[in-house]
């Protein structure tokens, strides 16, 4: 009987933890994402949709801008997860590659810019703690992480371009390379 009671308590505790997690999302990440979305759309309305579309069209002409500069700026300005939403301004064919690059930027830039991905800063701080224990400055680690990330995140987007083309060929589909006006 004790085993059944123990199992029942554990089972109910699972839902208690799930409820607490849900409440933390409702009071934490969900309002933040909602307000960031409102903020981003307000900036777009203030700047003008046509100017944002022109910048996206300009960025989509060059893979370095599309998978290097735009994801970095989006991660820096909007943080995770809103940086991923900037891909909506690119042509359909570039969206998978932008997502690959931008999602990596939300990780590799957090050593120097912790506001990008606050939820992951404990990983960097754990590594930086080891560097500090050795008597070294963790800033150099953060800069190296950022610089390597700039290069590797660009390549992640670029390689995803090639894999997207392979998948399109396999599936017999064609994603548009033209920017649609929003």
Curated annotation (Swiss-Prot):
Protein name, UniProt field: PTS system glucitol/sorbitol-specific EIIC component
PTS EIIC type-5 domain residues: 1-182
Subcellular location(s) per record: Cell membrane
Keyword Transport: yes
Cellular component GO terms held in the UniProt record: plasma membrane
Membrane topology: Multi-pass membrane protein
Record remark: domains: The EIIC domain forms the PTS system translocation channel and contains the specific substrate-binding site.
Lineage, highest ranks first: Bacteria, Bacillati, Bacillota, Clostridia, Eubacteriales
Pfam families xref list: EII-GUT
